[in-house]
């Protein structure tokens, strides 16, 4: 069993010297965005050239849930010498598209997403959708994954959050960081080594507080303690590395808080319109995983993956394990409860062999034999949520007009463990008053 540790052991920490408005704004936000007529973003990558980044308006102004005022949103397009192209939105700090070269010099968009802002506003994760939406490409926060019962205790104080996923809070609550408008900090990054941009969100003390009777908050919700400032820097280099660096500062001088950020991109290396990804090979650098109860909250144990459908220590076709009920009854029940794979893997301790760019630890490798594309995930986080799009039910149409269904993509959500605020044996997600954390994940394509 892993002993309790703090953010200090997982990331650099340094000492540095509302609800009603949000719900109303979300309703208005959807109405304003409905006028959006943004063209599809399915154009293939350009001819290989140097590193570049551009910025353009994306859709019509939408309402900022924090202020209630309409704001313009933007799309950033990063390209490298290989012709790889990444499109990033200031709405939700969403990764909209990633075009990667494959066999025969063919490019494909390898993440699921929508073509228009209207679709992101109305279909990603607003509270009008039961149990949230798919969170395509979102920057997830303030707390990624689930918190049991939508409640946790910190320093003797009980905090309550919206129960937007059955009895639990999922991916931050009713709004989450993915439904907010992020703002660019500084100029566009463009050096000989990389291009990129930093997007910022200030999450106030009491974020996700809601009045009694609000969906998911029958008795009202206190929201999260402490104001935090979140800066996420997205970069692309000529090696095909898509870097995501999170910097979170607790702006409060007295209140601690909990933080667990991640990226919720859905990958299909054959292309987002290619159908099931069951033949793609998955490898996860983990000897253990955290099994869950009937509502997908960890039981508190770290179970060996050996001899179970959760064993991806060697490259394994996704379809071999996703519905494998032939090993043991416990594992079978885990798959049935989650309708497939939707679990947290406990990443192995870093070794010289598993150390990659920026000194990060190997989390996972995915590959597609047909296209020849490969994705390697590097991180400093202790876990990764591997989710095989179990709940995509054919009601969403993607960026190229293709209908998305189960097993057509998968996520590698690098993270601290689900429900860590309620499970002291897990690595701690507490960010103390005045502290700053830094954490990085790299998605490397080849």
Regions found by a protein language model. Give the residues of each.
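Secretory targeting and sorting signals
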Residues: 2-41
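An exposed, glycine/acidic-rich loop-and-rim segment of catalytic or binding clefts
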Residues: 46-84, 89-446
